[in-house]
Amino acid sequence: MKIGILSRNPELYSTRKLYEAAIIRGHQARIIDPLLCYMTIASQRPTIHYKGEELTGFDAIIPRIGASITFYGTAVVRQFEMMNIYSVNESVAISRSRDKLRSLQLLSRKGIGLPHTCFAHSTRYTKDLINQVGGAPLVVKLLEGTQGIGVVLAETQKAAESVIEAFKGLKEQILVQEFIEESGGADIRCLVVGGKVVAAMKRQGAEGEFRSNIHRGGKATVVRLTPEERATAVRSAHIMGLNVAGVDILQSNRGPIVMEVNSSPGLEGIETATGKDVADEIIRFIEKHTKPGRTKTRGKG
């Protein structure tokens, strides 16, 4: 097969590993910067050009679309779909997962465990908003934030009011969520491929840090999932319509709590922590499921 890997940086660990895994499995592979693609929207023959040449002959693509290029990146993925090329994660599913509010609404509809969350436009009822999530301490989260950026722990009522009003004063869209204290600054990242958890790690935040992101100094170790945690991760990926997903779970007193479903999960941390070859699992999944025109939208909402 001929596989395109949509990534802006060929030197990134995840991009490199996917490229190498495809080559090892006997496929042709090419890394394509989606921002350098340009497309012709035509009813009879849609095309994509890249650096002056038309891209042809691809059987499948692996989108590695960063949050900062979601709009254009998903447009490129959608154009490949219009050309009957299989995408391991579809454009609509990527867009769905990038909208934190939409994701939470879809997951809640299906009964997935979530943190108590509020969303509001006005700061007029901030006190009641805070009460709705159980009061301080609470977490204020930018809708557009990634890798722990734009996530603030407000430990008191006064601090919570100040943070919410400050973000709103900057015209930012925010979520207000309960703080799951019993998680102890740790979460579980489950890597789901084709409806199965192929690897899982526990990430512990640095001392004094409630965010567990490895980018912020968190430490990763292999973890054994409970059946409920495994089922929650698989169901969450399915609800979002993602074949490949990183599902972030907190362990709470009321069971697994899903914090995020990521459509372009990094591979370095989880492969290093678990010793699992996740890139190989993704290529094997593509081998089994690639068919021309197989771009039926998965998930709803």
From Swiss-Prot:
- Say if the entry is tagged with keyword Manganese: yes
| Annotated binding of Mn(2+) 2, by residue | E260, N262
Question: Per UniProt, where does Mg(2+) 1 bind?
Answer: D248, E260
Record's GO cellular component, any one? cytoplasm
* GO BP terms, alphabetized: protein modification process; SOS response; translation
Q: Name one Pfam family in it.
A: RimK
- Identify the residues that bind Mn(2+) 1: D248, E260
The entry marks the following residues as binding Mg(2+) 2, namely E260, N262
- Enzyme type, top EC level: ligase
GO MF, any single term: metal ion binding
What family does the Swiss-Prot or TrEMBL record give for this protein? Belongs to the RimK family.
The family database entries (HAMAP family) matched by this protein are listed as: RimK
Name the chain's protein: Probable alpha-L-glutamate ligase
- Organism name: Syntrophotalea carbinolica (strain DSM 2380 / NBRC 103641 / GraBd1)
